[in-house]
Amino acid sequence: MGLTISSLFSRLFGKKQMRILMVGLDAAGKTTILYKLKLGEIVTTIPTIGFNVETVEYKNICFTVWDVGGQDKIRPLWRHYFQNTQGLIFVVDSNDRERIQEGAAVLQKMLLEDELQDAVLLLFANKQDLPNAMAISEMTDKLGLQSLRNRTWYVQATCATQGTGLYEGLDWLSNELSKR
């Protein structure tokens, strides 16, 4: 009985811990997103060599977000962050039509990893404020998301510099992860 009340109390008032891995090609906006969520402001960023890790508290959930550099030479290191990842945020520059196929290949390869088989996928279609940005339907098609089987995924249009769509994405992520 004490355990039941204790677990109910912790569900109502405690913070649930979530491990989130945020990856994507270089210059997609991962670090800008991380610090917009953490600090509520835009910070000047430089290309991430290695990783940034921050705790973001939102709606009674404590997200530990790992932002890992996206340059092609760093990508093989991503696998070191896969273990115990519950949610995967893949950030795509919606305006970068020249590299969307590269992004699709990187994403598809990563989703084959055993350690990520249970992770839900949130795709941030970033830089939606730019005039040449791909629509969500076009991006979904070019990334091959419709072919994903046995994977819970969602695409959220975002603009990291304005903060648009970021919390809507976290809402989806927290709803999906709290079902587990």
Swiss-Prot record:
Keyword Ligase: no
One Gene Ontology CC term in the entry: cytoplasm
Gene Ontology BP terms: apical protein localization; cell migration; dendritic spine development; epidermal growth factor receptor signaling pathway; establishment or maintenance of epithelial cell apical/basal polarity; intracellular protein transport; learning; negative regulation of apoptotic process
Residue numbers of Phosphoserine PTMs: 147
Signal sequence interval, chain numbering: none
UniProt-annotated binding residues for GTP: 24-31, 67-71, 126-129
Entry's localization field: Golgi apparatus; Membrane
Covalent lipid sites (N-myristoyl glycine): 2
InterPro entries cross-referenced by the UniProt entry: Arf1-5-like, P-loop_NTPase, Small_GTP-bd, Small_GTPase_ARF, Small_GTPase_ARF/SAR
Keywords: ER-Golgi transport, Golgi apparatus, GTP-binding, Lipoprotein, Membrane, Myristate, Nucleotide-binding, Phosphoprotein, Protein transport, Transport
Membrane protein topology class: Lipid-anchor
SMART domains (UniProt xref): ARF, RAB, SAR
Main location: Golgi
Entry's Gene Ontology molecular function annotations: epidermal growth factor receptor binding; GTP binding; GTPase activity; NAD+-protein-arginine ADP-ribosyltransferase activity; phospholipase D activator activity
Database matches in Pfam families: Arf
NCBIfam families (UniProt xref): small_GTP (TIGR00231)
Record's subunit section: Forms a complex containing RAB11A, ASAP1, RAB3IP, RAP11FIP3 and ARF4; the complex promotes preciliary trafficking; the complex binds to RHO in photoreceptor cells and promotes RHO ciliary transport.
Protein family according to the UniProt entry: Belongs to the small GTPase superfamily. Arf family.
PANTHER family xrefs: ADP RIBOSYLATION FACTOR-RELATED
Role played: GTP-binding protein that functions as an allosteric activator of the cholera toxin catalytic subunit, an ADP-ribosyltransferase. Involved in protein trafficking; may modulate vesicle budding and uncoating within the Golgi apparatus. Part of the ciliary targeting complex containing Rab11, ASAP1, Rabin8/RAB3IP, RAB11FIP3 and ARF4, which direct preciliary vesicle trafficking to mother centriole and ciliogenesis initiation.
Protein name in the entry: ADP-ribosylation factor 4
Source species of the chain: Rattus norvegicus (Rat)
